[in-house]
Amino acid sequence: MVGRTKDYFSKQSKAYQQFRPSYPQALFDFFESLLPDGAIIWDCAAGSGQASVHYSDKVACVIATDQSDKQLAHAPAHPRVRYAQSMAEVTPFPDHSVDMVTVAQALHWFDFDAFFPEARRVVRPGGVVAAWTYSFLDVTRALGTEIDAAIRSFYYDVIGPHWPPERRFVDERYTTIPFPLAPIEAPQISIEVSWDLDGVMGYLATWSSVQRYKDAGFDDPLPEFRRMLEAVWPSEEVLGPVHWPLALKIGRT
């Protein structure tokens, strides 16, 4: 029996929608170059729609699913996006009914042995499956090595023991996830944002390990960490670019 994909984000779904970075338009332009006009996309584990709403009208419809109704409740309305609650590994979709399956920052939570057969069933022959992740934010250009070292210490030393085991796939940039599809070469793409301290702290609040730290009975670690960052934060109110290189796995069925 297929189990539910682990849900580490419903409790912070509002912060997730507000502070998780958006993906660059270059990513969606690349995807559209692989698709026919009038394509249908299944955006699986869509969260609050971070990757669902950025396609041109070349794409007729995006069906954005997530097992968390709390996440979907914060997704933005869009005329070509239909939101629905569904697991990743078992869906109500007809056979060969979509042209592409996308998974943004979520594949590592899935039951791989169940998801990939379901994706093959749902996507049309020769269709595309794409999954991508971003791991540790690079702040050295914007904020310098001192703040980078502080965030890394928070990541590994303070909340490190509370990361779910699947997080290792992200740190390994998806290189150790089996991907049983004919690979497509992808360009190098990075997320870039300009953030103030509130933006950085809001993003950290969306981490699954922060929620698990609190669920384990510890006090919220973020207020103390914020005070430490405030002591070394540059005088400029907004700094950038903060960036994350994307690791993209993409292939055809």
List the predicted regions and their residue ranges.
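Class I S-adenosylmethionine-dependent transferase superfamily signal
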Residues: 31, 55, 119
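A short beta-strand submotif of the Rossmann-like class I SAM-dependent methyltransferase core
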Residues: 103-104, 112
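Conserved class I S-adenosyl-L-methionine
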Residues: 1-37, 50
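Conserved Class I S-adenosyl-L-methionine
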Residues: 170-253
